[in-house]
Amino acid sequence: MRYTVALTGGIGSGKSTVSDAFADLGITVIDADIIARQMVEPGQPTLNAIAEHFGSELIAADGTLRRRALRERIFSHPEEKAWLNALLHPLIQQETQRQFQQATSPYVLWVVPLLVENRLYQKANRVLVVDVTPETQLIRTMQRDDVTREHVEHILAAQATREARLAVADDVIDNNGAPDAIASDVARLHASYLKLASQFVSQEKP
């Protein structure tokens, strides 16, 4: 198994900004959210299964999934969320493993929004948390997704707390400021992870 840095953070924390910065340095990024989105693209069997289960009204005229409508449907129906997870999670895990096997960079950045909630941090060598204040999360998510404050507050209430994420963190990037401040933090961590990955490889060798 390649040395793995798990990246997590709450909604609106800026995980994509951070993961893009690592990708720019040549690091393989495996993003659970991106894999999940690919699973429900038009033509995928999973999208057909979702349409059959929830109804064709969740499919837009262009054949794509109406994600917001699906989110709203499962948010207030735990049993529907459980059904969707049972459908998607095995496929996401399978694709994640495939991408790990194909990775070529010295270490892999594994982006997992629900790392703490699903206790997946146990599968990583190191945990990097993108940290912002709850108020920053609210403002960014409202602007990005064009949703109400109440909607975002419901999402935040369902996610792990800021304290719970920080409790499992080995490294933290403070993303409350300007996005261009991220690059220097990522460069510093990248240098550290290269050393750790090298040590990991030498320990793995017989």
Curated annotation (Swiss-Prot):
Instruction: State the EC number(s).
Output: 2.7.1.24
InterPro entries per record:
Depp_CoAkinase, P-loop_NTPase
Reaction(s) this enzyme catalyzes, per UniProt: 3'-dephospho-CoA + ATP = ADP + CoA + H(+)
- Give one GO biological process term: coenzyme A biosynthetic process
Matching CDD domains: DPCK (cd02022)
Record bears the keyword ATP-binding: yes
Q: Where does the record say this protein resides?
A: Cytoplasm
Top enzyme class: transferase
Q: Where is the DPCK domain?
A: 4-200
Q: Which Pfam families does UniProt cross-reference here? A: CoaE (PF01121)
In this chain, ATP is annotated as bound at: 12-17
> What GO MF terms are annotated?
ATP binding; dephospho-CoA kinase activity
Q: What is its pathway?
A: Cofactor biosynthesis; coenzyme A biosynthesis; CoA from (R)-pantothenate: step 5/5
Q: Which UniProt keywords apply?
A: ATP-binding, Coenzyme A biosynthesis, Cytoplasm, Kinase, Nucleotide-binding, Transferase
Q: Which GO terms describe its cellular component?
A: cytoplasm
Q: What does the sequence similarity comment in the record state about its family?
A: Belongs to the CoaE family.
| General function of this protein | Catalyzes the phosphorylation of the 3'-hydroxyl group of dephosphocoenzyme A to form coenzyme A.
Protein known as:
Dephospho-CoA kinase
From the broadest rank down, the organism's phylogenetic lineage runs: Bacteria, Pseudomonadati, Pseudomonadota, Gammaproteobacteria, Enterobacterales
Gene that encodes the chain? coaE
